[in-house]
């Protein structure tokens, strides 16, 4: 898959530094990408909107880099990430779910419970259940336990594998 994105495709009207860091994150070598992810995350709120727009437009591999930057941006990213979880397809939703688990904000619990109940993708459901376990909210944990009872040991194994890897 092509990971490269042209500078003109990164359409942030604001800060040139944000544009340059997003470009470096998406196009740099591993070290450069990780440095850019850290720098973007440290900027907090100003990077959330441009990163969410990027999450919605780049290929699958690049989405995980964007999700890492959003997770590092912290609680300012929760509501926009919840919005992605509610409307996006699984390829975009999965990195957003991971980022929400990394942030650890309980505002994500109800939307994640909804995703666990409605997603048709076993991968998405397993990642969502792992995120709910990581968040540690009693309502989320209860929903995961209910899902384990309905789905069996195989699904529980996938969830625990995802949980231990997050």
What kind of region is each of these model predictions?
Residues 19-25:
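Short terminal alpha-helical segments
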Residues 1-13, 23, 30-45, 53-56, ...:
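Structural detector for internal amphipathic alpha-helices that build alpha-solenoid repeat scaffolds
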């Amino acid at each position: 898959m092509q990971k490269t994105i042209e500078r003109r495709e990164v359409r942030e009207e604001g800060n040139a530094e944000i544009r340059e860091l997003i470009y470096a994150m998406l196009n740099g070598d591993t070290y450069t990408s990780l440095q850019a992810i850290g720098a973007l995350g440290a900027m907090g709120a100003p990077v959330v909107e441009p990163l969410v727009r990027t999450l919605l437009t780049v290929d699958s591999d690049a989405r995980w880099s964007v999700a890492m930057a959003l997770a590092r941006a912290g609680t300012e990213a929760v509501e926009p990430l919840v919005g992605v979880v509610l409307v996006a397809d699984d390829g975009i939703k999965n990195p957003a779910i991971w980022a929400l688990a990394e942030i650890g904000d309980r505002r994500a619990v109800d939307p994640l419970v909804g995703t666990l109940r409605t997603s048709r993708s076993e991968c998405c459901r397993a990642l969502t259940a792992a995120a709910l376990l990581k968040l540690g909210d009693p309502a989320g944990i209860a929903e995961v336990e209910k899902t384990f009872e309905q789905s069996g040991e195989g699904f529980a194994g996938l969830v625990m594998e995802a949980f231990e890897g997050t």
